[in-house]
C-alpha cells in the first residue's frame, strides 16, 4: 500500500493518510483532536509520551461517532474515577463522553493511528466511573492525568463555562522560566502581560500557577481544579502548562500565547545582561487594551493603585 493511500481501523475510520481529504470519514471532533496533537508536536511540546489532551463531546459529536462505538456487550468495564487510591464523584459530568489520549502514548502518533492512541470514554450516570467505548486498540488506558482533566471540566462547568477542551503540554520556555521564577501567580502574570500586549487579551484574569507536584497525583489534581475555577491557563512549575477552552483553537491558542511570551521574556532578559528589560507594557497601557476590547482585568495583578 502506498503511504498516501491511508488505511482503516477496525471500526472503519481512516487513518495514516497524507491528505486532509482522506479523513472525510472521521467525525469532525476527532479530526480537530488529531490536528491539535499534530500542531503541539510540531511546536516541540510533546517529547516521548509527554502531554495529554481531552475533549468533552457535544450531543451531536456523540451521534456522529456512535456508529463506530463498540457494541454494548463489548465495551470496557466500568472503572472508578480515581488516582492513587483517591476516588471522585463528578455529577456535572454524568453521562458525558470524552475523547482522551492514552496513557504512555506519543501524541505524534495520534494523527497517523488515532484508534491505537486515543480512546472515547463514557461517564456513568452518577459521574463516578468511566468505561471505554472506542479506541485504544491493542490495549491501554486513558491518560494518567485523566482525573486532573475531569476535575478541570467540573471546575469550569461550576463556573458556568462551556469548557470542551483540556490540554496539557510540556512547553520548553515555560519550563525554563519556572527554573528562574518562583511559583507566584502575580509575578508570572505581570511578567507575561508586560512582555507582550496580546497576553492581557488572551488571559485578562491572569495565570494560575502551581508549585511542583508529582504528576498524576491527587494533590496536583486538587490544586489544578482550584486554580481552574478562576483561570483558563495554569502553569505547572518545572513541568508545563494546562489550559482549558471552549474549542480546540481556544485551548491551543492560550498555550501558544503563554509559551511564546515566555520565550520573548527570556530572550529580552538575556539580551539585557540578565536584568529586567527596561521597556515593558505599563499598567495604564494594560487598562487601555482591556477598555478597548471590553475585558475585565484582574485588579489584583496591577500596581497602579486605581480601585476596581
Roles of regions detected by a PLM:
Residues 2-308:
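Glycine-rich flexible loops
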Amino acid at each position: 500500500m502506498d503511504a498516501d493511500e491511508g488505511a482503516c481501523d477496525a471500526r472503519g475510520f481512516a487513518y495514516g493518510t497524507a491528505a486532509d481529504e482522506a479523513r472525510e470519514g472521521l467525525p469532525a471532533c476527532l479530526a480537530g483532536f488529531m490536528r491539535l496533537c499534530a500542531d503541539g508536536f510540531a511546536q516541540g511540546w510533546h517529547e516521548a509520551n509527554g502531554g495529554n489532551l481531552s475533549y468533552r463531546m457535544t450531543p451531536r459529536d456523540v451521534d456522529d461517532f456512535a456508529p463506530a462505538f463498540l457494541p454494548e456487550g463489548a465495551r470496557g468495564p466500568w472503572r472508578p474515577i480515581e488516582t492513587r487510591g483517591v476516588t471522585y464523584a463528578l455529577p456535572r459530568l454524568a453521562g458525558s463522553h470524552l475523547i482522551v489520549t492514552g496513557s504512555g502514548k506519543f501524541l505524534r502518533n495520534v494523527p497517523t493511528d488515532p484508534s491505537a492512541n486515543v480512546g472515547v470514554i463514557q461517564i456513568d450516570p452518577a459521574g463516578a466511573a468511566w468505561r471505554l467505548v472506542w479506541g485504544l486498540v491493542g490495549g491501554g488506558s486513558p491518560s494518567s492525568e485523566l482525573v486532573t482533566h475531569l476535575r478541570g471540566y467540573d471546575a469550569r462547568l461550576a463556573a458556568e463555562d462551556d469548557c470542551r477542551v483540556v490540554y496539557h503540554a510540556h512547553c520548553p520556555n515555560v519550563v525554563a522560566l519556572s527554573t528562574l521564577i518562583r511559583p507566584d501567580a502575580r509575578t508570572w502574570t505581570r511578567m507575561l502581560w508586560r512582555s507582550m500586549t496580546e497576553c492581557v487579551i488572551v488571559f485578562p484574569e491572569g495565570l494560575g500557577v502551581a508549585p511542583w507536584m508529582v504528576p498524576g497525583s491527587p494533590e496536583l489534581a486538587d490544586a489544578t481544579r482550584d486554580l481552574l475555577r478562576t483561570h483558563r491557563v495554569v502553569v505547572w512549575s518545572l513541568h508545563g502548562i494546562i489550559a482549558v477552552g471552549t474549542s480546540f483553537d481556544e485551548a491551543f491558542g492560550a498555550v501558544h500565547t503563554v509559551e511564546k511570551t515566555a520565550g520573548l521574556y527570556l530572550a529580552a532578559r538575556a539580551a539585557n545582561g540578565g536584568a529586567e528589560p527596561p521597556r515593558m507594557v505599563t499598567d495604564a497601557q494594560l487598562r487601555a487594551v482591556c477598555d478597548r476590547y471590553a475585558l475585565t482585568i484582574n485588579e489584583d495583578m496591577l500596581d497602579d493603585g486605581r480601585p476596581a
